[in-house]
Protein backbone atom coordinates (compact mmCIF):
# COMPACT_ATOMS: atom_id res chain seq x y z
CA UNK A 1 0.00 0.00 0.00
CA UNK A 2 1.38 3.48 -0.88
CA UNK A 3 2.77 5.63 1.93
CA UNK A 4 0.36 8.21 3.35
CA UNK A 5 1.06 11.50 1.57
CA UNK A 6 0.81 14.88 3.32
CA UNK A 7 -0.75 17.49 1.03
CA UNK A 8 -0.47 21.26 1.31
CA UNK A 9 -3.14 23.14 -0.64
CA UNK A 10 -2.24 26.72 -1.50
CA UNK A 11 -5.54 28.41 -2.32
CA UNK A 12 -7.85 25.94 -0.60
CA UNK A 13 -11.07 27.97 -0.85
CA UNK A 14 -10.90 28.40 -4.64
CA UNK A 15 -12.33 26.06 -7.25
CA UNK A 16 -9.12 24.06 -7.68
CA UNK A 17 -8.58 23.81 -3.93
CA UNK A 18 -12.10 22.54 -3.28
CA UNK A 19 -11.85 20.02 -6.11
CA UNK A 20 -8.52 18.82 -4.71
CA UNK A 21 -10.13 18.24 -1.33
CA UNK A 22 -12.95 16.36 -3.04
CA UNK A 23 -10.47 13.97 -4.72
CA UNK A 24 -8.43 13.56 -1.52
CA UNK A 25 -11.57 12.70 0.46
CA UNK A 26 -12.14 9.76 -1.91
CA UNK A 27 -8.76 8.27 -0.90
CA UNK A 28 -8.53 8.67 2.91
CA UNK A 29 -5.90 5.96 3.34
CA UNK A 30 -3.60 7.54 0.80
CA UNK A 31 -3.65 11.31 1.43
CA UNK A 32 -3.79 13.52 4.51
CA UNK A 33 -4.48 17.26 4.45
CA UNK A 34 -1.38 18.85 5.96
CA UNK A 35 -1.94 22.57 5.38
CA UNK A 36 -4.70 24.73 3.94
CA UNK A 37 -4.27 28.37 2.91
CA UNK A 38 -6.51 31.22 1.81
CA UNK A 39 -6.33 34.95 1.25
CA UNK A 40 -9.20 36.37 3.29
CA UNK A 41 -12.15 33.93 3.24
CA UNK A 42 -12.27 33.19 6.95
CA UNK A 43 -15.60 31.36 7.15
CA UNK A 44 -14.81 29.11 4.19
CA UNK A 45 -11.36 28.15 5.48
CA UNK A 46 -12.69 27.58 9.00
CA UNK A 47 -15.26 25.15 7.63
CA UNK A 48 -12.58 23.29 5.65
CA UNK A 49 -10.33 23.10 8.72
CA UNK A 50 -13.14 21.67 10.84
CA UNK A 51 -13.77 19.07 8.15
CA UNK A 52 -10.18 18.08 7.28
CA UNK A 53 -8.22 18.93 10.49
CA UNK A 54 -4.97 20.16 8.89
CA UNK A 55 -1.87 20.77 10.99
CA UNK A 56 -1.58 24.31 9.61
CA UNK A 57 -4.01 26.92 8.32
CA UNK A 58 -2.57 30.05 6.73
CA UNK A 59 -4.31 33.33 5.92
CA UNK A 60 -2.39 35.81 3.81
CA UNK A 61 -4.19 38.62 5.63
CA UNK A 62 -3.19 38.95 9.32
CA UNK A 63 -6.57 40.33 10.40
CA UNK A 64 -8.29 37.38 8.79
CA UNK A 65 -5.89 35.02 10.58
CA UNK A 66 -6.94 36.43 13.96
CA UNK A 67 -10.59 35.82 13.13
CA UNK A 68 -9.77 32.29 11.97
CA UNK A 69 -7.93 31.61 15.22
CA UNK A 70 -11.09 32.45 17.15
CA UNK A 71 -13.21 30.15 15.01
CA UNK A 72 -10.78 27.24 15.45
CA UNK A 73 -10.46 27.42 19.24
CA UNK A 74 -10.00 23.95 20.67
CA UNK A 75 -8.69 22.58 17.36
CA UNK A 76 -5.06 21.47 17.10
CA UNK A 77 -4.67 23.32 13.79
CA UNK A 78 -1.99 26.02 14.05
CA UNK A 79 -3.03 29.30 12.43
CA UNK A 80 -0.33 31.34 10.67
CA UNK A 81 -0.42 34.48 8.52
CA UNK A 82 1.53 36.29 5.84
CA UNK A 83 3.55 35.45 2.75
CA UNK A 84 6.41 33.93 4.76
CA UNK A 85 3.96 31.46 6.31
CA UNK A 86 2.72 30.46 2.85
CA UNK A 87 6.30 29.74 1.84
CA UNK A 88 6.85 27.82 5.10
CA UNK A 89 3.97 25.37 4.59
CA UNK A 90 4.89 24.99 0.90
CA UNK A 91 8.44 23.96 1.79
CA UNK A 92 7.72 22.16 5.09
CA UNK A 93 9.82 18.97 5.44
CA UNK A 94 6.72 16.90 6.23
CA UNK A 95 4.74 18.06 3.18
CA UNK A 96 5.03 15.63 0.28
CA UNK A 97 2.66 17.22 -2.24
CA UNK A 98 1.91 20.90 -2.83
CA UNK A 99 -1.13 21.99 -4.81
CA UNK A 100 -0.18 25.47 -6.05
CA UNK A 101 -3.60 26.98 -6.74
CA UNK A 102 -3.35 30.57 -5.51
CA UNK A 103 -4.78 32.84 -8.21
CA UNK A 104 -2.55 35.66 -9.40
CA UNK A 105 0.97 36.86 -8.73
CA UNK A 106 0.61 36.12 -4.99
CA UNK A 107 1.19 32.43 -5.77
CA UNK A 108 4.68 32.95 -7.18
CA UNK A 109 6.84 32.90 -4.05
CA UNK A 110 5.16 29.89 -2.37
CA UNK A 111 5.50 27.90 -5.61
CA UNK A 112 9.18 28.82 -5.81
CA UNK A 113 9.63 27.70 -2.18
CA UNK A 114 8.05 24.33 -2.97
CA UNK A 115 10.31 23.93 -6.01
CA UNK A 116 13.52 24.63 -4.10
CA UNK A 117 12.34 22.21 -1.38
CA UNK A 118 11.98 19.40 -3.93
CA UNK A 119 8.24 18.83 -3.55
CA UNK A 120 5.81 17.14 -5.90
CA UNK A 121 4.17 20.30 -7.23
CA UNK A 122 0.72 20.19 -8.78
CA UNK A 123 0.84 23.50 -10.61
CA UNK A 124 -2.50 25.24 -11.15
CA UNK A 125 -1.18 28.79 -10.73
CA UNK A 126 -0.62 30.20 -14.22
CA UNK A 127 1.27 33.27 -13.09
CA UNK A 128 4.22 31.27 -11.76
CA UNK A 129 5.19 30.23 -15.28
CA UNK A 130 3.91 33.35 -17.04
CA UNK A 131 5.84 35.75 -14.81
CA UNK A 132 8.87 33.68 -13.93
CA UNK A 133 8.97 30.63 -16.19
CA UNK A 134 12.74 30.63 -16.61
CA UNK A 135 13.45 31.08 -12.89
CA UNK A 136 10.78 28.61 -11.80
CA UNK A 137 11.95 25.84 -14.12
CA UNK A 138 15.50 26.41 -12.88
CA UNK A 139 14.24 26.09 -9.28
CA UNK A 140 12.43 22.84 -10.13
CA UNK A 141 15.64 21.41 -11.57
CA UNK A 142 17.89 22.64 -8.77
CA UNK A 143 15.53 21.45 -6.03
CA UNK A 144 14.82 18.10 -7.66
CA UNK A 145 11.09 18.79 -7.57
CA UNK A 146 8.50 16.85 -9.56
CA UNK A 147 6.31 19.19 -11.61
CA UNK A 148 2.87 18.10 -12.78
CA UNK A 149 0.67 20.62 -14.62
CA UNK A 150 -2.96 20.77 -13.49
CA UNK A 151 -4.45 23.09 -16.10
CA UNK A 152 -6.61 20.68 -18.09
CA UNK A 153 -4.85 21.56 -21.35
CA UNK A 154 -1.29 21.17 -20.08
CA UNK A 155 -2.23 18.06 -18.16
CA UNK A 156 -3.62 16.64 -21.40
CA UNK A 157 -0.42 17.49 -23.27
CA UNK A 158 1.65 15.93 -20.48
CA UNK A 159 -0.36 12.72 -20.78
CA UNK A 160 0.20 12.32 -24.54
CA UNK A 161 3.86 13.39 -24.69
CA UNK A 162 6.89 11.13 -24.13
CA UNK A 163 7.46 10.57 -20.38
CA UNK A 164 10.88 12.24 -20.19
CA UNK A 165 11.08 16.05 -20.36
CA UNK A 166 12.49 17.03 -23.74
CA UNK A 167 15.14 19.65 -24.42
CA UNK A 168 13.37 20.23 -27.74
CA UNK A 169 10.09 18.97 -29.23
CA UNK A 170 11.94 17.41 -32.16
CA UNK A 171 13.77 15.10 -29.72
CA UNK A 172 10.44 13.37 -29.11
CA UNK A 173 9.39 13.37 -32.75
CA UNK A 174 6.86 16.13 -32.07
CA UNK A 175 5.79 18.50 -34.84
CA UNK A 176 3.58 20.83 -32.77
CA UNK A 177 1.30 21.22 -29.78
CA UNK A 178 -2.41 21.81 -30.44
CA UNK A 179 -3.85 23.73 -27.49
CA UNK A 180 -7.64 23.59 -27.42
CA UNK A 181 -9.90 26.45 -26.32
CA UNK A 182 -13.65 26.46 -25.78
CA UNK A 183 -13.87 29.90 -27.36
CA UNK A 184 -15.72 31.20 -24.30
CA UNK A 185 -19.30 32.47 -24.09
CA UNK A 186 -18.84 35.10 -26.85
CA UNK A 187 -17.33 32.91 -29.56
CA UNK A 188 -19.98 33.99 -32.08
CA UNK A 189 -20.54 37.55 -30.81
CA UNK A 190 -20.04 40.53 -33.11
CA UNK A 191 -17.80 43.52 -32.33
CA UNK A 192 -20.88 45.53 -31.37
CA UNK A 193 -22.12 42.80 -29.04
CA UNK A 194 -18.69 42.50 -27.40
CA UNK A 195 -18.73 46.23 -26.67
CA UNK A 196 -21.88 45.73 -24.60
CA UNK A 197 -20.82 42.62 -22.63
CA UNK A 198 -21.53 42.82 -18.88
CA UNK A 199 -19.58 41.10 -16.08
CA UNK A 200 -22.58 38.84 -15.38
CA UNK A 201 -22.61 37.66 -19.00
CA UNK A 202 -18.85 37.11 -19.05
CA UNK A 203 -18.98 35.04 -15.86
CA UNK A 204 -21.35 32.52 -17.49
CA UNK A 205 -18.92 30.03 -19.05
CA UNK A 206 -20.57 27.41 -21.29
CA UNK A 207 -18.51 24.39 -20.16
CA UNK A 208 -16.33 24.93 -17.10
CA UNK A 209 -17.01 25.95 -13.49
CA UNK A 210 -14.13 28.25 -12.50
CA UNK A 211 -13.31 31.25 -10.34
CA UNK A 212 -14.24 34.76 -11.56
CA UNK A 213 -10.79 35.85 -12.74
CA UNK A 214 -10.09 32.79 -14.88
CA UNK A 215 -13.67 32.86 -16.22
CA UNK A 216 -13.18 36.40 -17.53
CA UNK A 217 -9.78 35.38 -18.93
CA UNK A 218 -11.52 32.56 -20.77
CA UNK A 219 -14.06 34.99 -22.22
CA UNK A 220 -11.30 37.30 -23.57
CA UNK A 221 -9.09 34.34 -24.65
CA UNK A 222 -6.36 35.71 -22.37
CA UNK A 223 -6.60 32.44 -20.47
CA UNK A 224 -5.52 30.64 -23.63
CA UNK A 225 -2.79 33.20 -24.20
CA UNK A 226 -1.40 32.60 -20.72
CA UNK A 227 -1.56 28.86 -21.38
CA UNK A 228 0.51 29.33 -24.54
CA UNK A 229 3.24 30.94 -22.42
CA UNK A 230 2.94 28.14 -19.85
CA UNK A 231 3.24 25.50 -22.56
CA UNK A 232 6.41 27.17 -23.80
CA UNK A 233 8.09 26.68 -20.41
CA UNK A 234 6.60 23.31 -19.50
CA UNK A 235 7.41 21.59 -22.79
CA UNK A 236 10.29 23.65 -24.26
CA UNK A 237 7.98 24.65 -27.10
CA UNK A 238 8.69 27.77 -29.18
CA UNK A 239 5.74 30.02 -30.03
CA UNK A 240 5.59 28.84 -33.65
CA UNK A 241 5.16 25.22 -32.49
CA UNK A 242 2.05 26.00 -30.42
CA UNK A 243 -1.27 26.35 -32.23
CA UNK A 244 -4.55 27.31 -30.55
CA UNK A 245 -7.61 25.43 -31.81
CA UNK A 246 -11.11 26.50 -30.80
CA UNK A 247 -13.09 23.40 -29.80
CA UNK A 248 -16.47 24.44 -28.34
CA UNK A 249 -17.37 21.11 -26.71
CA UNK A 250 -14.27 21.06 -24.43
CA UNK A 251 -14.09 17.28 -24.77
CA UNK A 252 -10.62 17.15 -26.30
CA UNK A 253 -8.45 18.94 -23.76
CA UNK A 254 -5.43 19.26 -26.06
CA UNK A 255 -3.43 17.34 -28.65
CA UNK A 256 0.13 16.63 -29.73
CA UNK A 257 1.00 16.12 -33.40
CA UNK A 258 3.98 13.89 -34.22
CA UNK A 259 6.21 13.96 -37.29
CA UNK A 260 4.73 10.68 -38.59
CA UNK A 261 1.33 12.35 -38.92
CA UNK A 262 -0.14 10.89 -35.73
CA UNK A 263 -2.15 13.20 -33.48
CA UNK A 264 -2.61 12.03 -29.89
CA UNK A 265 -5.44 13.62 -27.92
CA UNK A 266 -6.61 13.39 -24.32
CA UNK A 267 -10.39 13.41 -23.99
CA UNK A 268 -12.85 13.49 -21.13
CA UNK A 269 -15.71 15.38 -19.54
CA UNK A 270 -14.76 18.95 -18.57
CA UNK A 271 -14.12 18.36 -14.86
CA UNK A 272 -11.00 19.61 -13.05
CA UNK A 273 -11.00 16.57 -10.78
CA UNK A 274 -9.56 14.52 -13.66
CA UNK A 275 -6.23 16.42 -13.97
CA UNK A 276 -6.09 16.84 -10.19
CA UNK A 277 -6.42 13.08 -9.65
CA UNK A 278 -3.83 12.48 -12.36
CA UNK A 279 -1.38 14.80 -10.60
CA UNK A 280 -2.00 13.29 -7.18
CA UNK A 281 -1.67 9.69 -8.31
CA UNK A 282 0.91 9.94 -11.11
CA UNK A 283 2.01 7.57 -12.55
CA UNK A 284 -1.01 5.67 -11.21
CA UNK A 285 -4.63 6.49 -12.04
CA UNK A 286 -7.08 7.35 -9.26
CA UNK A 287 -10.86 7.43 -9.10
CA UNK A 288 -11.89 11.09 -9.22
CA UNK A 289 -15.69 10.96 -9.07
CA UNK A 290 -15.92 12.05 -12.72
CA UNK A 291 -18.63 10.57 -14.94
CA UNK A 292 -17.56 8.47 -17.90
CA UNK A 293 -17.48 10.25 -21.25
CA UNK A 294 -20.57 9.43 -23.33
CA UNK A 295 -19.48 9.88 -26.95
CA UNK A 296 -23.01 9.26 -28.22
CA UNK A 297 -24.28 12.12 -26.07
CA UNK A 298 -21.44 14.37 -27.27
CA UNK A 299 -22.40 13.50 -30.84
CA UNK A 300 -19.93 15.74 -32.64
CA UNK A 301 -16.62 17.52 -32.20
CA UNK A 302 -16.11 20.91 -33.84
CA UNK A 303 -12.92 22.87 -34.49
CA UNK A 304 -12.22 26.38 -35.75
CA UNK A 305 -9.46 28.96 -35.79
CA UNK A 306 -9.45 31.67 -33.09
CA UNK A 307 -10.39 35.20 -34.19
CA UNK A 308 -7.65 37.46 -32.83
CA UNK A 309 -9.32 40.53 -34.33
CA UNK A 310 -12.32 40.13 -32.01
CA UNK A 311 -10.20 38.63 -29.21
CA UNK A 312 -6.84 40.47 -29.32
CA UNK A 313 -5.72 39.21 -25.90
CA UNK A 314 -4.55 35.97 -27.55
CA UNK A 315 -2.38 37.95 -30.00
CA UNK A 316 -0.97 40.07 -27.15
CA UNK A 317 0.07 36.92 -25.28
CA UNK A 318 1.83 35.45 -28.32
CA UNK A 319 3.58 38.81 -28.82
CA UNK A 320 4.71 38.86 -25.18
CA UNK A 321 6.09 35.33 -25.48
CA UNK A 322 8.03 36.24 -28.62
CA UNK A 323 9.43 39.40 -26.98
CA UNK A 324 10.43 37.38 -23.91
CA UNK A 325 12.11 38.88 -20.85
CA UNK A 326 9.71 40.79 -18.61
CA UNK A 327 7.02 41.15 -21.32
CA UNK A 328 4.89 38.21 -20.04
CA UNK A 329 5.06 39.59 -16.46
CA UNK A 330 3.89 43.00 -17.72
CA UNK A 331 1.10 41.33 -19.70
CA UNK A 332 -0.01 39.36 -16.65
CA UNK A 333 -0.03 42.33 -14.26
CA UNK A 334 -1.91 44.58 -16.68
CA UNK A 335 -4.45 41.83 -17.30
CA UNK A 336 -5.10 41.32 -13.58
CA UNK A 337 -5.82 45.04 -13.16
CA UNK A 338 -7.97 45.09 -16.30
CA UNK A 339 -10.07 42.09 -15.23
CA UNK A 340 -10.59 43.55 -11.76
CA UNK A 341 -11.63 46.89 -13.28
CA UNK A 342 -14.08 45.14 -15.62
CA UNK A 343 -15.63 43.06 -12.83
CA UNK A 344 -16.11 46.24 -10.80
CA UNK A 345 -17.76 48.06 -13.69
CA UNK A 346 -14.93 50.55 -14.22
CA UNK A 347 -14.08 49.59 -17.82
CA UNK A 348 -15.82 47.76 -20.66
CA UNK A 349 -15.10 44.25 -21.90
CA UNK A 350 -13.25 45.47 -24.99
CA UNK A 351 -11.22 47.88 -22.85
CA UNK A 352 -9.40 44.89 -21.32
CA UNK A 353 -7.07 44.32 -24.32
CA UNK A 354 -6.77 48.09 -24.87
CA UNK A 355 -5.46 48.55 -21.33
CA UNK A 356 -3.04 45.63 -21.63
CA UNK A 357 -1.63 46.82 -24.95
CA UNK A 358 -1.20 50.36 -23.60
CA UNK A 359 0.83 49.10 -20.63
CA UNK A 360 2.98 46.81 -22.81
CA UNK A 361 3.70 49.77 -25.10
CA UNK A 362 4.53 52.11 -22.21
CA UNK A 363 7.04 49.86 -20.44
CA UNK A 364 10.56 48.80 -21.34
CA UNK A 365 11.16 45.06 -21.67
CA UNK A 366 14.19 43.75 -19.78
CA UNK A 367 15.94 40.41 -19.42
CA UNK A 368 14.70 38.48 -16.37
CA UNK A 369 17.31 38.35 -13.60
CA UNK A 370 15.52 37.71 -10.28
CA UNK A 371 12.22 37.30 -8.48
CA UNK A 372 12.67 40.69 -6.81
CA UNK A 373 13.04 42.30 -10.24
CA UNK A 374 9.82 40.61 -11.43
CA UNK A 375 7.94 41.81 -8.35
CA UNK A 376 9.09 45.37 -9.10
CA UNK A 377 8.04 45.01 -12.75
CA UNK A 378 4.69 43.63 -11.62
CA UNK A 379 4.11 46.62 -9.33
CA UNK A 380 5.14 49.13 -12.01
CA UNK A 381 2.88 47.50 -14.61
CA UNK A 382 -0.05 47.63 -12.17
CA UNK A 383 0.63 51.32 -11.54
CA UNK A 384 0.63 52.01 -15.29
CA UNK A 385 -2.60 50.03 -15.66
CA UNK A 386 -4.33 51.93 -12.85
CA UNK A 387 -3.20 55.23 -14.35
CA UNK A 388 -4.62 54.23 -17.75
CA UNK A 389 -7.91 53.24 -16.14
CA UNK A 390 -8.18 56.56 -14.30
CA UNK A 391 -7.40 58.56 -17.46
CA UNK A 392 -10.06 56.63 -19.39
CA UNK A 393 -12.60 57.38 -16.67
CA UNK A 394 -12.05 61.15 -16.99
Swiss-Prot record:
UniProt superkingdom: Bacteria
Gene: dxr
Keywords: Isoprene biosynthesis, Manganese, Metal-binding, NADP, Oxidoreductase
Pathway given in the UniProt record: Isoprenoid biosynthesis; isopentenyl diphosphate biosynthesis via DXP pathway; isopentenyl diphosphate from 1-deoxy-D-xylulose 5-phosphate: step 1/6
GO annotation (BP), single: isopentenyl diphosphate biosynthetic process, methylerythritol 4-phosphate pathway involved in terpenoid biosynthetic process
Ranges in coiled-coil conformation: none
Keyword DNA damage assigned: no
Binding site for 1-deoxy-D-xylulose 5-phosphate: 126, 152-153, 182, 205, 218, 223-224, 227
Its biological purpose: Catalyzes the NADPH-dependent rearrangement and reduction of 1-deoxy-D-xylulose-5-phosphate (DXP) to 2-C-methyl-D-erythritol 4-phosphate (MEP).
Binding site for NADPH: 13-16, 125, 127, 211
Single GO molecular function: manganese ion binding
Keyword Transmembrane attached: no
Known catalytic reactions: 2-C-methyl-D-erythritol 4-phosphate + NADP(+) = 1-deoxy-D-xylulose 5-phosphate + NADPH + H(+)
Matches recorded under InterPro entries: DXP_reductoisomerase (IPR003821), DXP_reductoisomerase_C (IPR013644), DXP_reductoisomerase_N (IPR013512), DXPR_C (IPR026877), DXPR_C_sf (IPR036169), NAD(P)-bd_dom_sf (IPR036291)
Annotated positions binding Mn(2+): 151, 153, 227
Cofactor(s) essential for the protein: Mg(2+); Mn(2+)
Gene3D superfamilies attached to this UniProt entry: 1.10.1740.10, NAD(P)-binding Rossmann-like Domain
Enzyme Commission number: 1.1.1.267
Protein name (Swiss-Prot/TrEMBL): 1-deoxy-D-xylulose 5-phosphate reductoisomerase
Family classification: Belongs to the DXR family.
Amino acid sequence: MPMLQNVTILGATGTIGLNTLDVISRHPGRYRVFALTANSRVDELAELCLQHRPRYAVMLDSGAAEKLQQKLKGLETQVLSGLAALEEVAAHPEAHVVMAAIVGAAGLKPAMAAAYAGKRILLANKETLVMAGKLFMQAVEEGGATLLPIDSEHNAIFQVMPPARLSALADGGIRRILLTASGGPFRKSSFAELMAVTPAQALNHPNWVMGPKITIDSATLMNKGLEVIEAHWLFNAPADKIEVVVHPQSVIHSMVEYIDGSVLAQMGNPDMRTPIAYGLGYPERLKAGVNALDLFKVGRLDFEAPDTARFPCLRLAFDALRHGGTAPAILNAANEVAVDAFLNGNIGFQDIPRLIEAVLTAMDIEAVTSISQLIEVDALARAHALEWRQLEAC
